[in-house]
Swiss-Prot record:
It comes from Zymomonas mobilis subsp. mobilis (strain ATCC 31821 / ZM4 / CP4). GO terms for cellular component: glutamyl-tRNA(Gln) amidotransferase complex. One of its GO terms (molecular function) is ATP binding. Belongs to the amidase family. GatA subfamily. This is Glutamyl-tRNA(Gln) amidotransferase subunit A. The gene is gatA.
Length: 492
């Protein structure tokens, strides 16, 4: 018999609706799995009361014939989303005990649709990182292991807790946020599916800000179909977010089709970068062959300015972060350090020195530097010009094709600690994901295979603005042909 924890979002939703099992049974199964997986350190805070309360409501709604779109589906929530009455930390000591008096729009939509919350998921501190090693609550450990090797691996970042929890089947799906690849890279590292929607498609209200012109929430799940079902609930205009796009939310799940015959798939030549592992190159070719097999036409395209994307991103994102993180000063909430005999300025300095981690401090310093009077034009303005050129490159490419197919990451998951001392090597993890973020485009990663060490590898699909449907459809075609069913062997 299939274990309930083996089922995805839509299977659980449909099973509860048919009466195959109760929402309470589902919640209890995932809560048990979570309690047995402390070694992964995927959660910062567990919320069994919320999951069980929502399950009880779902069972009552089923009895009265009033089921909602996600009734009884338990989810993991990245601890960057403010949850009314539940501790929200952004994985930082500076707001260690912050309990929001309000709900983020995304979680409000999910809970109103009947979903429950198993817990708040670990992440890189303030979503700044690519390996989940910058969390003040300890790093998340990937459920995956290399063949014959017990070395602890990164689940990716910043949504590492979300990726690890879904891959280990502690939750059927989770929310993530993506600023420069923080949904797509960890999804690729852990063999799950992750979707970053068009910038503005999902509300940022109540999501603790990293870089406001880049941050975008999205779903992480076991399948393309599950991502489509979740995105339908998460997306939508929100007047509380000034960057929210006022457009209709399509019925992505119902319109899902793997028939991509006649679609033009662009292959950007600039994504063949130095240092890309041969296994990634061959995986990309396999993906191209799968798209051909599905009836799509393959077209070579050029994105000439993407070679500068990483440099531009690591100027723009820290600049915005330095502004956003200026609000954490120890006055109203969170950590407060007051040196004996010190004044207000001393309290600010001591609080921020003690409360922020090294990577956050590094990015605040970079951001403050590039925004300073002497360097604003030389760095920040130049980076914004590059960003505009990258967006134009994508526009030109999409005149010739419908979707772009690229690698998701330059390597498979690496060992924890391997790149921690070298920020540049760590930043290079985002080389394939950052360009779509700078252009605000929808993009998703789909698991396609394993490398020789038995670790998952994914490919990325990038679409036109607000054309998540084409991305999902191409993702489904890839998913069906890849037939990826590998799971991590339980060691935790």
């Amino acid at each position: 018999m299939t274990r309930l924890t083996d089922l995805g979002v839509t299977d659980l939703r449909d099973g509860i609706a048919k009466g195959d099992f109760s929402a309470k049974e589902v919640a209890e199964s995932f809560l048990t799995a979570t309690n047995e997986a402390e070694k992964l350190n995927a959660f910062i805070t567990l919320t069994p009361d919320h999951a069980l309360k929502q399950a009880e409501k779902a069972d009552k709604d089923r009895a009265s014939g009033q089921l909602k779109p996600l009734s009884g589906v338990p989810l993991g929530i990245k601890d960057l989303f403010c949850t009314n009455g539940y501790r929200t930390t952004a994985a930082s000591k500076i707001i260690d005990n912050f309990v929001p008096p309000y709900e983020s729009t995304i979680t409000e939509k999910l809970f109103s649709a009947g979903a429950g919350m198993v817990g708040k998921l670990n992440l890189d501190q303030f979503a700044m990182g690519s390996s989940n090693e910058t969390s003040a609550f300890g790093n998340v450990i990937s459920p995956w292991r290399q063949k014959g090797d017990d070395t602890a691996l990164t689940p990716g970042g910043s949504s590492g807790g979300s990726a690890a929890a879904v891959a280990a089947k502690l939750v059927p799906a989770a929310t993530g946020t993506d600023t420069g690849g923080s949904i797509r890279q960890p999804a690729s590292f852990t063999g799950i599916t992750g979707l970053k929607p068009t910038y503005g498609r999902c509300s940022r209200y109540g999501v603790i800000a990293f870089a406001s012109s880049l941050d975008q929430a999205g779903p992480m799940a076991h399948s393309v179909k599950d991502c489509a079902a979740l995105l339908e609930v998460m997306a939508g205009f929100d007047p509380k977010d000034s960057t929210s796009v006022d457009v209709m939310v399509p019925n992505w799940e119902k319109l899902l089709s793997s028939d991509i015959r006649g679609k033009k798939i662009g292959i950007p030549k600039e994504y063949r970068v130095d240092g890309m592992a041969p296994e990634i190159e061959s995986l990309w070719q396999r993906g191209i062959d799968m798209m051909k097999d599905a009836g799509a036409e393959i077209i070579d395209v050029s994105l000439p300015h993407t070679q500068h994307a990483l440099a531009a991103y690591y100027i723009i994102a820290p600049a915005e972060a330095s502004s956003n993180l200026a609000r954490y000063d120890g006055v109203r909430y969170g950590e407060r350090k007051t040196p004996e005999g010190g004044n207000l300025a001393d309290m600010y300095a001591a609080t921020r020195a003690a409360g922020f981690g090294d990577e956050v401090k590094r990015r605040i310093m970079i951001g403050t530097y590039v925004l300073s009077a002497g360097f604003y034009d030389a760095y920040y303005i130049k980076a914004q010009k590059i960003r505009a050129l990258i967006a134009r490159d994508f526009e030109a490419a999409f005149d010739k094709c419908d979707i772009l197919l690229t690698p998701a990451t330059p390597t498979a998951a690496f060992a924890l600690g391997q790149k921690q001392e070298d920020p540049i090597a760590m930043y290079l993890n985002d080389v394939f994901t950052v360009p779509a973020s700078l252009a605000g485009l929808p993009a998703m990663t789909v698991p396609v295979g394993l490398n020789e060490q038995g670790l998952p590898l994914g490919l990325q699909l990038i679409g036109k603005p607000l054309d998540e449907q084409s991305v999902l459809n191409a993702g489904l075609a890839l998913e069906e042909r890849a037939g990826f069913t590998s799971q991590p062997k339980k060691w935790w």
